[in-house]
């Protein structure tokens, strides 16, 4: 079995819930659901993706290595375009497989969007 490399963001939720911001196993990097700052779905999605990018960087990957994302929103009718626009701006070239789902709520009421990402690092 390949070694697991755990990446922490320092979030207070990590030790409480028992998770890592990201885990790298071999050529794969899995980034946990990540929320962002901002007043609307666009800003929160951009912020979440910036945090994901930092975790990927610490794992030796980049946004270009992302092969799948999941976007969770609290009101898909009102938020899908803004969240989708921020996602498109970040992943314009990589164009990962992506799902967007509506959820009843996120961990805090001010959070509108949460993003997960999976990356694959091809052999050099």
Name each model-derived stretch.
Residues 1-124:
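Short, polar/acidic, helix-capping and beta-turn segments at strand->helix junctions
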């Amino acid at each position: 079995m390949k070694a697991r490399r755990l990446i922490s963001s320092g979030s207070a939720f990590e030790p409480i819930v028992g998770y890592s911001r990201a885990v790298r196993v071999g050529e794969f990097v899995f980034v946990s659901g990540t929320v962002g700052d901002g007043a609307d779905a666009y800003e929160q999605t951009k912020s979440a993706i910036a945090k994901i990018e930092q975790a990927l960087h610490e794992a030796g990957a980049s946004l270009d290595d992302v092969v799948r994302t999941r976007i969770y929103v609290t009101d898909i009718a009102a938020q899908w375009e803004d969240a989708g626009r921020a996602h498109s701006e970040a992943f314009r070239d990589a164009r990962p497989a992506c799902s967007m789902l509506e959820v009843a709520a996120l961990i805090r009421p001010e959070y509108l969007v949460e993003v997960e990402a999976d990356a694959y690092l091809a052999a050099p």
